[in-house]
């Protein structure tokens, strides 16, 4: 049976095993036991809040398949509340020379800052052996259902 649920501190060993055996596929979660534990505690604290307005909360979800944790996803709220988020925006710029009859489109990356707090879908990882059959979709969409509740 498949089940998506919020993470618990007691999941530490299983979540740690999932992350540390993910190879290069898991770039959004810490690798050390101490840092993973902090993330789980942060999520549990967020779960216990009676929230009217999000304020730097984290919600980690696990996908269980027959009792084994095989996937992880997350929601982060109020990103950029205390310091701006930095991101790159891709655009296209056109160079043109009429005298040379030359036109060239160039991809340009420009640096942007976001100072408005926003919520972010983060971390989505599923063990390769469990991909397909809608499991990744379930793990991802569970976040939207949680946000709409």
Enumerate the predicted regions with their spans.
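A short helix-loop-beta-strand connector motif used in the catalytic cores of GNAT acetyltransferases and
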Residues: 41-61, 71
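Long, low-complexity intrinsically disordered regions in eukaryotic nuclear regulators
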Residues: 13, 34-37
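Hydrophobic adenine-recognition pocket in adenosine-nucleotide-binding enzymes
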Residues: 7, 124-126
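A short beta-loop-alpha structural element at the N-terminal edge
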Residues: 3-17, 28
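Conserved beta-strand in the GNAT
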Residues: 60-62, 68-77, 120
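Conserved acetyl-CoA-binding loop-helix of GNAT-fold acetyltransferases
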Residues: 104-108, 126, 131-147
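Conserved acyl-donor/pantetheine-binding loop and adjacent beta-alpha core of acyl/acetyltransferases
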Residues: 77-123
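Helix-loop element at the rim of GNAT/NAT acetyltransferase active sites that forms part
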Residues: 17-34, 43-52
């Amino acid at each position: 049976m498949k089940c998506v649920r919020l993470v618990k501190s007691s999941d530490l060993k299983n979540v740690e095993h999932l992350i540390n055996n993910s190879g290069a596929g898991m770039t959004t979660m810490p690798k050390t036991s101490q840092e993973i534990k902090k993330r789980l505690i942060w999520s549990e604290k967020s779960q216990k809040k009676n929230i009217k307005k999000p304020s730097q909360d984290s919600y980690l979800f696990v996908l269980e398949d027959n009792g084994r944790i095989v996937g992880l996803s997350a929601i982060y709220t109020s990103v950029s509340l205390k310091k701006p988020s930095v991101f790159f925006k891709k655009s296209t710029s056109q160079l043109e020379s009429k005298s040379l009859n030359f036109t060239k489109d160039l991809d340009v990356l420009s640096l942007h800052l976001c100072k408005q707090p926003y919520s972010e879908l983060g971390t989505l990882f599923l063990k390769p052996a469990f991909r397909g059959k809608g499991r990744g979709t379930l793990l991802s969409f569970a976040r939207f259902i949680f946000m709409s509740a």
